[in-house]
Amino acid sequence: MIHFKGLIFYHYSAGDDVAIHTQDMAWLEESDVVVAEVTQPSLGVGYEIGRAVAWKKRILCLYRPDDGKGLSAMVRGAHDGKNFIVKDYQEPEVPGILKEFLSSS
């Protein structure tokens, strides 16, 4: 577990799939907000975002447009300006984007 100015990041080693799913869903359910980096397509991240939407969590999706790949319309189209935010970003902008998102929670 890594603490960063009030944020907690978890890292764990490979293990039983059911245990990983159970733990990730517990962390997600306990969270107030979800921040997802969505530049690389990921079924797991998409699943977690879907569960977060179902649980009415505030969600921030961060996307680096310079990577040459387009962002899924399902993610970009979910942006509502309030509970589901999609932000294109460059690395130096991340602290400010996080501060703005978390202060409006």
From Swiss-Prot:
<feature type="binding site">
    <location>
        <position position="44"/>
    </location>
    <ligand>
        <name>5-hydroxymethyl-dUMP</name>
    </ligand>
</feature>
<dbReference type="GO" id="GO:0009159">
    <property type="term" value="P:deoxyribonucleoside monophosphate catabolic process"/>
</dbReference>
<keyword id="KW-0539">Nucleus</keyword>
<keyword id="KW-0963">Cytoplasm</keyword>
<dbReference type="GO" id="GO:0009117">
    <property type="term" value="P:nucleotide metabolic process"/>
</dbReference>
<comment type="function">
    <text>Part of a nucleotide salvage pathway that eliminates epigenetically modified 5-hydroxymethyl-dCMP (hmdCMP) in a two-step process entailing deamination to cytotoxic 5-hydroxymethyl-dUMP (hmdUMP), followed by its hydrolysis into 5-hydroxymethyluracil (hmU) and 2-deoxy-D-ribose 5-phosphate (deoxyribosephosphate). Catalyzes the second step in that pathway, the hydrolysis of the N-glycosidic bond in hmdUMP, degrading this cytotoxic nucleotide to avoid its genomic integration.</text>
</comment>
<feature type="binding site">
    <location>
        <position position="6"/>
    </location>
    <ligand>
        <name>5-hydroxymethyl-dUMP</name>
    </ligand>
</feature>
<dbReference type="InterPro" id="IPR028607">
    <property type="entry name" value="DNPH1"/>
</dbReference>
<feature type="binding site" description="in other chain">
    <location>
        <position position="72"/>
    </location>
    <ligand>
        <name>5-hydroxymethyl-dUMP</name>
    </ligand>
</feature>
<dbReference type="GO" id="GO:0043174">
    <property type="term" value="P:nucleoside salvage"/>
</dbReference>
<feature type="binding site">
    <location>
        <position position="8"/>
    </location>
    <ligand>
        <name>5-hydroxymethyl-dUMP</name>
    </ligand>
</feature>
<feature type="binding site">
    <location>
        <position position="48"/>
    </location>
    <ligand>
        <name>5-hydroxymethyl-dUMP</name>
    </ligand>
</feature>
<dbReference type="GO" id="GO:0070694">
    <property type="term" value="F:5-hydroxymethyl-dUMP N-hydrolase activity"/>
</dbReference>
<dbReference type="GO" id="GO:0005737">
    <property type="term" value="C:cytoplasm"/>
</dbReference>
<keyword id="KW-0546">Nucleotide metabolism</keyword>
<keyword id="KW-0326">Glycosidase</keyword>
<comment type="similarity">
    <text>Belongs to the 2'-deoxynucleoside 5'-phosphate N-hydrolase 1 family.</text>
</comment>
<dbReference type="GO" id="GO:0030307">
    <property type="term" value="P:positive regulation of cell growth"/>
</dbReference>
<dbReference type="InterPro" id="IPR051239">
    <property type="entry name" value="2'-dNMP_N-hydrolase"/>
</dbReference>
<dbReference type="InterPro" id="IPR007710">
    <property type="entry name" value="Nucleoside_deoxyribTrfase"/>
</dbReference>
<dbReference type="Pfam" id="PF05014">
    <property type="entry name" value="Nuc_deoxyrib_tr"/>
</dbReference>
<feature type="binding site">
    <location>
        <position position="42"/>
    </location>
    <ligand>
        <name>5-hydroxymethyl-dUMP</name>
    </ligand>
</feature>
<comment type="subunit">
    <text>Monomer and homodimer.</text>
</comment>
<keyword id="KW-0378">Hydrolase</keyword>
<dbReference type="GO" id="GO:0005634">
    <property type="term" value="C:nucleus"/>
</dbReference>
<protein>
    <recommendedName>
        <fullName>5-hydroxymethyl-dUMP N-hydrolase</fullName>
        <ecNumber>3.2.2.-</ecNumber>
    </recommendedName>
</protein>
